[in-house]
A protein has these predicted regions:
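A general structural motif
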Residues: 113-129, 146-154, 173-181
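Conserved small/polar residues in nucleotide/adenosyl-binding loops
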Residues: 235-241
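Metallocofactor- and cofactor-centric catalytic cores in central/energy metabolism, strongly enriched
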Residues: 172-176, 180-181, 212-221
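Conserved thiamine diphosphate
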Residues: 1-44, 68, 217, 221-233
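Conformationally flexible catalytic loops at phosphate/diphosphate-handling active centers
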Residues: 38-133
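Redox- and metal-dependent alpha/beta enzyme cores, enriched for Fe-S-associated oxidoreductases
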Residues: 139-166, 179-184
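Short acidic, glycine/serine/threonine-rich loops at helix termini
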Residues: 22-25, 49-56, 155-157, 182-183, ...
Length: 243
């Protein structure tokens, strides 16, 4: 899914089947109101094929959250043979980039739309979904940043270590694109000294993998240069065998 990050699509990540059920409406509702297409993604096979009991949405609840004015505007903007319009005409580079810059305001406004619908879902379900979610000790000095199914495993590790008095935590990335640095900074514990960023990919020849580079840029721009940042690239994690 990292290959899609430059397409202009917003990208929303889920960790497990229940989160897929809970947050999929956010992608649809925010796409309609925010006027930006969404990629709603989760781990292929690890999450998509997982057998798990989940709480399903009541369509009446979804209807209450739907902005019908935005739906009307969305339909009016769609291609319609009764109201033909020309799109995708040729542009030279100078005009194309002016159009791309003109889109900035839409992407800057989108996180607030996503956050609004997450808030509506939290009210319905009693959850606490946010652009980034923190889990662990309030005074953690070591933090993992990750997205996808690894987060469920990481939560179990956090529970095990905090029960032993370790000061550790996890930040789960929900809205991957647009990347919101301020939202990430809000959930990083003030006591954090070391951060490990987990990327489930490998880009040979790159300075770092995608999520790591986003986090590194956020910390650099915020002047948090004292935090030790570590990149971790993985496909799957295994426990060491006992001797």
């Amino acid at each position: 899914v990292y290959a899609c990050r430059q397409t202009g699509f917003a990208m929303l990540a889920e960790t497990n089947p229940q989160e897929v059920m809970d947050l999929s409406p956010v992608a649809h509702l925010a796409a309609i109101e925010g006027k930006v297409p969404f990629i709603n993604f989760f781990d292929g096979f690890r999450t998509s094929h997982e057998i798990q009991k989940i709480e399903k949405w009541d369509y009446a609840d979804l209807k209450e959250m739907c902005n019908m004015d935005a739906v009307k505007a969305f339909r009016e903007h769609a291609l319609n043979p009764e109201h033909p319009a020309m799109r995708g005409s040729h542009e030279n580079g100078d005009v194309f980039f002016q159009h791309r810059e003109a889109c900035n305001s839409v992407y800057e406004a989108l996180p607030a739309v996503v956050k609004k619908y997450m808030g509506k879902i939290n009210e319905k379900l009693g959850t606490n979904y946010d652009l980034f979610n923190y889990y662990g000790a309030e005074d953690a000095d070591r933090v993992i940043i990750a997205m996808g199914s690894i987060c469920d495993v990481a939560e179990e590790v956090i529970d095990y270590l905090t029960a032993k008095g370790e000061k550790v935590g996890l930040i789960k990335v929900r809205l991957y694109r647009p990347w919101v640095s301020s939202a990430l900074l809000d959930v990083i514990p003030k006591t954090a000294k070391k951060i490990a960023v987990l990327d489930r990919t490998k880009e040979p020849g790159a300075l770092g993998d995608p999520l790591y580079l986003d986090v590194a840029t956020t910390l650099r721009e915020a002047g948090l240069n004292d935090i030790v940042l570590t990149a971790v690239s993985y496909t799957h994690l295994t426990l060491p065998k006992k001797a």
